[in-house]
Amino acid sequence: MQIHTTIQSLRAARAAVSGKVALVPTMGNLHDGHIALMRQATGHADSIVASIFVNRLQFGPRDDFDRYPRTFKADCERLEAAGVAHVFAPDEGEMYPQPQQYHVDPAPAHVTILEGEFRPDHFRGVATVVLKLLNIVRPDVALFGKKDYQQLMVLTNMVRELAVAVEVVPGETIRATDGLALSSRNGYLSAEERVEAPRLYRELARVRDAVRDGDRDFLKLETEAVAGLAAHGWHPDYIAVRRRADLQPPGDANDPLVVLAAAKLGHTRLIDNLEI
């Protein structure tokens, strides 16, 4: 496995690769969900590139940029074991040698709702760095996890509307045996909070099952789920049933749906979703 810290080095290595290339962007602090994406990528390409870059642009003033764990050595060991051929790990000066003046501004309808309401400019930062990574690596395939469902929707639309020559492949959410979605932020939970954390999944599953059984009173289901979390010390930001395609409120009864949630448990904000 080769580790590249400069754009020039990565591009030279990319030029020497024959066959299909897959990119899996990460911010490091890898868990089994990331590794599942790497293994999934092997089914779509001959060579896998994983990026490790903690992107300041997608962190808000109250987010945890400085607190985000950096575990580079352990990450590289896991990536090599998963069959990754190249790691692109630039520092901030390499990715942003001067303050970034050009950005990708996603459609307001996609980024002022749900996560966008609570994290202004987050998706602007995500879309900007991902487009930059796609331009650097020039992969045939890029993989993103469904756990960040709104991010996946934004990036899929960005790639389509900007005619980027890459196939976006979604990866299923990987969960602990108790249902908690794997996330780098789970490490912030105390022992007691970790026991409580799967309740977020259970509330989502309850909404999903009710809708599958024919309940179309989405507001009632959302309100009950919020109350169920709040009764156990959570501080929910939202639980919402939305259309998968654009995360707008459901319309036609045949629209494929997803239920999404974000809530704070102690000092840790968790997000999750389930397709219906």
From Swiss-Prot:
EC numbers: 6.3.2.1
Q: Which GO terms describe its cellular component?
A: cytosol
Q: Which residues bind (R)-pantoate?
A: 58, 151
A GO MF annotation of the entry reads:
ATP binding
Localization terms from the record: Cytoplasm
Against SUPFAM superfamilies, the record matches this protein to: Nucleotidylyl transferase (SSF52374)
What the entry lists under InterPro entries is as follows: Pantoate_ligase (IPR003721), Pantoate_ligase_C (IPR042176), Rossmann-like_a/b/a_fold (IPR014729)
Function field: Catalyzes the condensation of pantoate with beta-alanine in an ATP-dependent reaction via a pantoyl-adenylate intermediate.
NCBIfam families under this entry? Answer: panC
Miscellaneous comment text of the record: The reaction proceeds by a bi uni uni bi ping pong mechanism.
* Family classification: Belongs to the pantothenate synthetase family.
The protein's name in its UniProt record: Pantothenate synthetase
What taxonomic lineage is listed for the species of origin? Bacteria, Pseudomonadati, Pseudomonadota, Betaproteobacteria, Rhodocyclales
Q: Provide the gene name from the record.
A: panC
